[in-house]
Structure formats: C-alpha cells, structure tokens
C-alpha cells in the first residue's frame, strides 16, 4: 500500500482520489509522497521516506527544488492544468480596464439611494466611456500554456496580436494562431502596444523584465496586465508610469504593499487559477504524475529531474537511480550489475542540468547486496526498487 500525505486544501470539494493501492496518512513521516498546493516548504524538514512531491499548480517558488533533488526527491508540477482559468481572468481584465466597468458599478452603488437614479445614470455614463478591444494592439510575453491561449483568444476578439517567446515549444507553436505575429525582441513587442500582458515564469532573466524602458515604448494610455509572477514587474516603474499617465491601468494578481497603493489598479487575490475546474484539473494531473512515478518510475513534468519513461513496469525487476549528472555513473551501475550476473533487459538515462536519472529492467530480482552496492556509488542520491 502506497501512502500519500496531502498538504493544503487540494480541491474545493475536498475530493482527492488515488484509487486502489493507495491510502492517505496524517503525517509526512508515514508517507511515500506529498500532494500539495501553496504551503511554503523552505525550511521544512523533509522526512527521508518521501520519494516525490507533486504541486497542484505550475509555480514551485514555495518548494526548494534543488535541495530536494540532491535528496533524490522528484518534484512535479501541473503546468497547463489551470491555463484556461487564468486566460479567462486575463480576458476579463482586458474588458474591465477598457470600459470603465468598475467605476460605473461603484457610481451605481454610491448612488443607490438616489430616487432619480435612472435619469442620473444616463447623465453619469458619459464619465465612463471606454474603448473597444477590436483593432487594438496587444503584446503577449510568453507563449506557453497560458500565453498561447490568451494570444489566440485576443485574435478571436479582433485584436492585433504580437507575441514574444524565444523559447516557445513545438507543442505551443503548433496551437498558436497564424494571426499571432511573433517578434524577435522584447523591445519590438512593446513598441506601440495598447495592451501588454505577461505570461512567463519567475527566473533570473525575467525578474524585473518590465520596467521603465519597456513601459516608455508602449502606446499612450496603455494597459499592463500581470497574471504570471509578481517579480516580473518593476513595481516602482509601474507606480511612476501610472501617476504620470503613461499607463492608464495596471491589473495584476498580486496584492503587495506597493501595488495596493498604486492609482488605477485592478488587483485580485492571486485568483488566476481560482476555479473549481482548475483545481480539479491540477489535482488530476499531479495525481497521475505521482502514480506513474511511484508505480513505474516514469517522470513527466518534473522541475528538478529530466523527463524519462519506460512505460509499465513489466519485467521481473525495475530499478531507478537518482544521481548527479557526472561522468561514469552508468559505467559504475552496469559494473555492479555485471558483477552480480544481473541481465539488463532495458535501460534508459536522461539528464537535466546537474541531475540525472537512470532506470533499468532486469530479468531477475536483485538481491539486497546489489541494491546496497548501487547506493554506495559516489554522487548517487537515491536508489528505488520499483518492482
């Protein structure tokens, strides 16, 4: 029986199902794997028995992924599972920032006791005249799971859509509308845009990527939308641009001491993925990833180990080795297997950065001394007997 510890409320209705052969436990010390959402694990003392962690969501800033990699713990996320929810909210922000909707609603609420509100509302509406999205230029930074959907939806709205993503995958390139015009530099994307929306992860080369230089390239009264990560935006630059009228509106999903005091902002409570459907999709993906790893050793959508698959574990034995990406690891592994007369039926090795993953099937079960010898190889983080 494989044991799972859940952290956080995984789904709105509380239903999380792994199926036969699994049980939920109350402490991480009892568990083989952790299913989680937003709890910060930095500084958390991870029990040695934990083999994997799956986050129901895309961002993993709350998990020390490299530290866990060195412990032989595979960290999974669920990219794209909540992308439709984020896309829909971004589209909503496009409309809200263009049509004076919030201001108009506030006027109605503030004048609720006016006996002549029908007449006065007709007079007041002149103050809330906005602009249509059709024909406006929008720049989409990042054409991954969310960005590609946003770009395609903006095409459907009749917008003039430009996209920037030097690392776009083949998968996302295939689904991107032909009407999305790709540009080669961030500056070319920003130049003349009426709207700019950001959909990239927080990394060393994306932190503060939208600052004064980029804002100054936008069209007058442009709208900036950030439903990616709060660090992508230089808050001081955005604040100044709003106060100087270079930006008409700023919409984001991150309430910070700085953003909440900016003028002309639409700020939500980190709600981009906040739908029941998105929560369920993320949980389903994370559960599927954990099950395939625990049962077969296969890795998909890991943030600290390479993708690797050998299908169902059907041989007499399957072993997985999590180790540093250094020379002669495979040679040392196969030497130990040969010494013990173990016949390797299939074998695969993949690497990603400093970490590597080797998995092999054998025609016979390996004895404990062979497994122990594998564990003693220098730079070996963990050896798993899957079957």
For each of these PLM feature ranges, what is it?
Residues 216, 220-313, 322-324, 357, ...:
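Rossmann-like dinucleotide-binding domain for NAD(H)/NADP(H)
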Residues 146:
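Hydrophobic/small residue at the entry helix of a nucleotide-binding pocket
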Residues 39-44, 167-259, 274:
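Rossmann-like adenosine-cofactor binding region
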Residues 1-79, 211-213, 217, 234, ...:
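An N-terminal-biased, well-structured beta-alpha scaffold segment characteristic
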Residues 79-137, 301-303:
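Phosphate-binding beta-alpha-beta segment of Rossmann-like dinucleotide-binding domains, i.e.
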Residues 304-387:
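A conserved regulatory-domain signal marking ACT and ACT-like small-molecule sensing domains
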Residues 87-106, 155-159, 284-298, 334-342:
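Oxidoreductase and adenylate-handling cofactor-binding alpha/beta cores
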């Amino acid at each position: 029986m494989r044991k799972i510890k859940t952290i956080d409320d995984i789904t709105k209705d509380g239903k999380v199902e792994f199926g036969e052969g699994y049980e939920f436990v109350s402490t991480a010390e009892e568990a083989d794997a952790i299913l989680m959402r937003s709890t910060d694990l930095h500084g958390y003392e991870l029990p040695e028995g934990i083999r994997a962690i799956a986050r129901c969501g895309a961002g993993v800033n709350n998990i020390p992924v490299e530290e866990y990699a060195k412990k032989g713990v595979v960290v999974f996320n669920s990219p794209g599972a909540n992308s439709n929810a984020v896309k829909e909210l971004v589209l909503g922000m496009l409309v809200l920032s263009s049509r004076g909707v919030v201001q108009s609603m506030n006027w109605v609420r503030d004048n609720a006791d006016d006996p002549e509100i029908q007449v006065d509302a007709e007079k007041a509406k002149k103050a809330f005249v906005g602009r249509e999205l059709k024909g406006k230029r929008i720049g989409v930074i990042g054409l991954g799971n969310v960005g590609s959907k946003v770009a395609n939806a903006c095409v459907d709205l009749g917008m003039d859509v430009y996209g920037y993503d030097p690392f776009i995958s083949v998968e996302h390139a295939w689904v991107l509308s032909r009407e999305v015009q790709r540009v080669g530099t961030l500056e070319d994307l920003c130049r003349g845009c009426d709207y700019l929306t950001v959909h990239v992860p927080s990394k060393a080369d994306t932190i503060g990527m939208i600052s004064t230089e980029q804002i100054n390239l936008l069209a007058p009264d442009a709208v900036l939308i950030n439903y990616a990560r709060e660090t992508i935006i230089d808050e001081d630059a955005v604040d100044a641009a709003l106060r100087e009228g270079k930006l008409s509106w700023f919409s984001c999903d991150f309430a910070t001491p700085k953003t909440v005091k900016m003028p002309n902002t639409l700020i939500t409570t980190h709600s981009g993925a906040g739908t029941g459907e998105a929560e369920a999709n993320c949980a389903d993906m994370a559960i599927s990833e954990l099950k395939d790893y625990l049962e077969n050793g296969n890795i998909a959508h890991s943030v600290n180990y390479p993708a690797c698959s050998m299908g169902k574990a059907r041989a007499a034995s399957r072993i997985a080795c999590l180790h540093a990406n250094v020379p002669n690891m495979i040679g040392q592994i196969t030497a130990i297997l040969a010494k013990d007369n173990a016949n390797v039926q299939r074998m695969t090795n993949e690497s990603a950065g400093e970490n590597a993953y080797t998995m092999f099937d054998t025609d016979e079960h390996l004895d404990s001394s062979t497994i122990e010898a594998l564990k003693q190889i220098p730079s070996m983080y963990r050896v798993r007997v899957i079957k």
